[in-house]
Amino acid sequence: MLNKLYDWVDERLDITPLWRDIADHEVPEHVNPAHHFSAFVYCFGGLTFFVTVIQILSGMFLTMYYVPDIKNAWESVYYLQNEVAFGQIVRGMHHWGASLVIVMMFLHTLRVFFQGAYKKPREMNWIVGVLIFMVMMGLGFTGYLLPWDMKALFATKVGLQIAEAVPLIGPAIKTLLAGDPEIVGAQTLARFFAIHVFFLPAALLGLMAAHFLMIRRQGISGPL
């Protein structure tokens, strides 16, 4: 049944060459841990992507229960944590995954830097990678406020004060993030939720697509 469906689609769209090109792509010998033990350092990028996928899937589950409102945000998180089946596990995955993805990305960045993989002709991919790092940090910052507890509230106030200290555009950045520059309240929570769930993930997906396309085009760099 599935084979017939696949053949029907393949006859019209010729999809076999597309997935065969990916499936048959050979892993370079210098990045294969089976041949070189030190090649495990090349796994940090893939591990970063793997944890990112977990973050996306667990985040989609969390949005089914989370209420981005100052009166209900904490209660919705409490309900998710204590009443929803597997809610505590999924939230724990998202919580710890947020830290793990930064660690993996940091290790990946160190590998690229110390092996000189950012040099010509891969300068553009390095820039895209740095932008991905910044987006990930933004996701961590905006997500921290969403439980709407005291720790998150005061941490966000500190973060907004840091943003305000940016020369020239600092006050505008703070107003953009917080809504009301004087109060961390309903507008701040709503904006952080929108940025965390819509704006930054959209930017992340676009940057990751560009990152992977350039890797595919240029190949994986060896030590330089």
From Swiss-Prot:
Binding sites annotated in the UniProt record for heme c: 43, 216, 220
Per UniProt, heme b 2 binds at 91, 94, 196
Write one Gene Ontology MF term. oxidoreductase activity
Which UniProt keywords are listed? Answer: Cell membrane, Electron transport, Heme, Iron, Membrane, Metal-binding, Transmembrane, Transmembrane helix, Transport
Instruction: Quote a single Gene Ontology cellular component term.
Output: plasma membrane
Instruction: Enumerate the residues binding heme b 1.
Output: 42, 108, 111, 211, 221
For this protein, what does the record note about how its cofactor is bound? Binds 2 heme b groups non-covalently with two histidine residues as axial ligands.
Where is this chain primarily localised?
A: membrane
Record CDD domains: Cytochrome_b_N
Compartmental location = Cell membrane
Q: Give the transmembrane region(s).
A: 37-57, 96-116, 126-146, 195-215
Pfam family name, one: Cytochrome_B
Biological process annotations from GO: respiratory electron transport chain
- Required co-factor? heme b; heme c
Q: Sorted alphabetically, which PROSITE patterns does this protein's record hold?
A: CYTB_NTER
Please report the record's description of how this protein sits within the membrane. Multi-pass membrane protein
Q: What does this protein do?
A: Component of the menaquinol:cytochrome c reductase complex.
Q: How does it assemble?
A: The main subunits of the menaquinol:cytochrome c complex are a Rieske-type iron-sulfur protein (QcrA), a cytochrome b (QcrB) and a cytochrome c (QcrC).
Can you tell me which family this protein belongs to?
Belongs to the cytochrome b family.
- UniProt name for this protein: Menaquinol:cytochrome c reductase cytochrome b subunit
